[in-house]
């Protein structure tokens, strides 16, 4: 028995592995936070409350540009418009060395899938972990200055998983005042400015299931110059849910 246990245990090495993986750059490999999917609590409730589908995937696309290690990702989470969003799927994505990549899966499959990190539909963004998915992607709020956030900023952070259901599977709502709006970890990326969705500039550090860290902020909810118009005037005629996400590996 002892021999079998010894053979089953890999020999530890003091040398860092300098290999690339599918979620980050070619850096020293970090310790994984989780490697196996866990059951999503309140699964029936999230399917109903979030209008999840098992027969369709998002038609939205993701476009990436990169400069000095910082990515700007335009994410189409329009889902057919505000009046049709509940009839359409969420868009799922993962952070990789090649940019933010779409994960083409349906909503109910995503409840058992660890390959995605982040999902969006209209003004709601959720992470793969806790009440939202089977993985362990967590978020910690940091300062509002994206450029000032570096690896030292991640010291002693408490990464929180999605926790928008009570033990009785009742939905916890955010502070927006919008009925049925869940208190997701990234919910404070926006606030009402007049009649539109204004961005707050809040920055988070996200911890992926691999242990890699990503600094993340929402630069815009609206396409083109719509966000600047909203933030400064309180209204905009530009299409919403055409996000611009800014992020970088730490």
Task: List PLM regions with ranges.
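Surface-exposed, beta-sheet-biased, low-hydrophobicity segments with strongly acidic/polar composition
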Residues: 16, 24-250
């Amino acid at each position: 028995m002892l021999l079998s246990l010894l053979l089953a245990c890999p020999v530890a090495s003091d040398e860092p592995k300098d290999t690339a993986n599918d979620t980050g750059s070619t850096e020293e490999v970090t310790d994984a936070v989780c490697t196996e999917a866990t059951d999503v609590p309140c699964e029936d409730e999230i399917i109903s409350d979030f209008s999840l589908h098992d027969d369709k995937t998002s038609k939205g696309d993701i476009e990436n540009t990169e400069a000095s290690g910082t990515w700007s990702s335009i994410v189409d989470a329009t889902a057919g418009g505000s009046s049709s969003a509940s009839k359409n799927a969420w868009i799922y994505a993962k952070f990789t060395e090649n940019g933010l990549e779409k994960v083409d899966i349906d909503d109910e499959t995503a409840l058992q899938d660890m390959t995605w990190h982040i999902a969006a539909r209209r003004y709601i963004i959720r992470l793969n972990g806790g009440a939202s998915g089977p993985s362990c992607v967590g978020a910690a709020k940091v300062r509002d200055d994206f450029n000032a956030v570096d690896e030292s900023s991640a010291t002693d952070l408490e990464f929180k998983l999605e926790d928008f259901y009570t033990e009785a599977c009742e939905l916890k709502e955010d502070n927006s005042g919008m009925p049925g709006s869940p208190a997701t970890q990234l919910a404070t990326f926006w606030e009402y400015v007049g009649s539109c969705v204004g961005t707050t500039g809040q920055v988070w550090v996200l911890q992926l299931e691999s242990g890699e860290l990503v600094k993340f902020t929402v630069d815009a909810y609206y396409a083109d110059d719509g966000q600047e118009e909203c933030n400064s005037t309180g209204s905009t005629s530009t299409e919403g849910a055409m996000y611009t996400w800014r992020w970088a590996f730490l």
